[in-house]
Swiss-Prot record:
The organism of origin for this protein: Archaeoglobus fulgidus (strain ATCC 49558 / DSM 4304 / JCM 9628 / NBRC 100126 / VC-16)
General function of this protein: Component of the A-type ATP synthase that produces ATP from ADP in the presence of a proton gradient across the membrane.
Gene: atpF
Main location: membrane
Cellular location(s): Cell membrane
Keywords annotated in UniProt: ATP synthesis, Cell membrane, Hydrogen ion transport, Ion transport, Membrane, Transport
Molecular function via GO: ATP binding; proton-transporting ATP synthase activity, rotational mechanism; proton-transporting ATPase activity, rotational mechanism
Stated name of the protein: A-type ATP synthase subunit F
Similarity-based family: Belongs to the V-ATPase F subunit family.
Lineage top rank: taxon: Archaea
InterPro entries named in the record: ATPase_V1-cplx_f_g_su (IPR008218), ATPase_V1-cplx_fsu_bac/arc (IPR022944), ATPase_V1_fsu_sf (IPR036906)
Gene Ontology cellular-component annotations: plasma membrane
Pfam families tied to this protein: ATP-synt_F
Membrane topology (UniProt): Peripheral membrane protein
Subunit organization: Has multiple subunits with at least A(3), B(3), C, D, E, F, H, I and proteolipid K(x).
Length: 101
């Protein structure tokens, strides 16, 4: 079974830690955000990555493109305006099934 990883600042990640998620990448700078995303992309055991929406904007275009094109891990951004439709599309892309139908 694939794991869930979280990338965010300490305030963002604390709730996930309390929920029992152990693959946490706490970041406090733009450089740490890039490094954390690069690290999680190298892992074969992570299926979903939860990341703050604003952090995606701080990634280099090449890295953002890689995230968009990969099926696994699937990146789910939290705190943006995409809402349910964005999450629906990401899940459909990851597993090949539209769970809302």
């Amino acid at each position: 079974m694939k794991k869930l990883a979280v990338v965010g600042d300490p305030d963002f990640t604390i709730g996930f830690m309390l929920a029992g998620i152990s693959d946490i990448y706490e970041v406090t700078s733009d450089e740490e955000i890039v490094k954390a995303v690069e690290d999680v992309l190298k892992r074969d055991d992570v299926g979903v990555v939860i990341i703050k929406q604003e952090y995606l904007k701080k990634l280099p275009p090449v890295l953002r493109r890689e995230i968009d094109e990969k099926v696994e891990p699937t990146f789910v951004s939290v705190g943006g305006t995409g809402g349910v439709e964005e999450i629906r599309e990401k899940i459909r892309k990851a597993i090949g099934v539209d769970l809302w139908k």
